[in-house]
A protein has these predicted regions:
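C-terminal, loop-rich substrate-recognition/catalytic regions characterized by aromatic stacking residues
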Residues: 1-201
Length: 201
């Protein structure tokens, strides 16, 4: 296909103290959040004031953006927990028809298809499934996590889950940073620990 493989091109986005996510250097300041070990991902990625995460967004995209491969997030973070943790989510903000997460994104239909031959103990007819579609205001594109094995300052690179997806023009790309991610990984910091990120990193 003419659009595959994707021509390699790396773009670096830097978080800003005003909540922006821009091409260029990061702000020469730090921001902090307080870990909430019971916070859901849905709460963390919803816009508005939230002391339990940091959220950065680009401006509205003037043209479609294709993300292909594994995003990386580099940060310098300081904490005081015996063992700390950081989670990051890359988010597409913008209303669109998407595959919904409910029921693992599919539902069982009333029709059946035959796969091979039936036997006395195995019926080859199976109900068909279809994608569960619906409009949603956002979509998580990728996630990543890191465990911080001792208190202090850590400089690290988080390799996020690979994806190949197009973010439409008019949407915003967002990055949420949290501590515990109880829906995805084991919680190792169950306290209200303050995490500080140096945006110059």
């Amino acid at each position: 296909a003419r659009d595959w493989p994707v021509r390699e091109h790396e773009t670096r986005l830097a978080p800003q103290t005003n909540g922006g996510l821009v091409i260029g250097p990061g702000s020469k300041q730090s921001l902090s959040w307080v870990n909430n070990p019971t916070q859901t991902e849905a709460t963390a990625i919803t816009g508005g004031d939230n002391p339990n995460r940091l959220l950065f967004t680009t401006g509205f995209l003037t043209r479609a953006l294709r993300i292909s491969g594994a995003p990386q997030f580099q940060l310098e973070v300081t904490h005081s927990a015996p063992t700390g943790q950081v989670g990051v989510e890359l988010v597409d903000y913008g209303d669109a028809e998407r595959v919904l997460s409910e029921g693992e994104g599919v539902f069982t239909t009333d029709t059946q298809s035959c796969w091979g031959d039936s036997t006395d103990t195995d019926d080859a007819w199976y109900f068909d499934v279809a994608r569960r579609m619906g409009h949603s205001p956002l979509q998580v594109l990728s996630r990543g996590w890191a465990r911080l094995d001792h208190p202090g300052t850590h400089r690290l690179t988080i390799d996020m889950i690979p994806n190949d997806i197009i973010v439409p023009a008019g949407h915003q790309l967002g990055l949420a940073i949290v501590g515990a991610s109880p829906e995805w990984v084991v919680t190792v910091d169950a306290a209200a620990t303050t995490y500080v990120v140096d945006l110059r990193a």
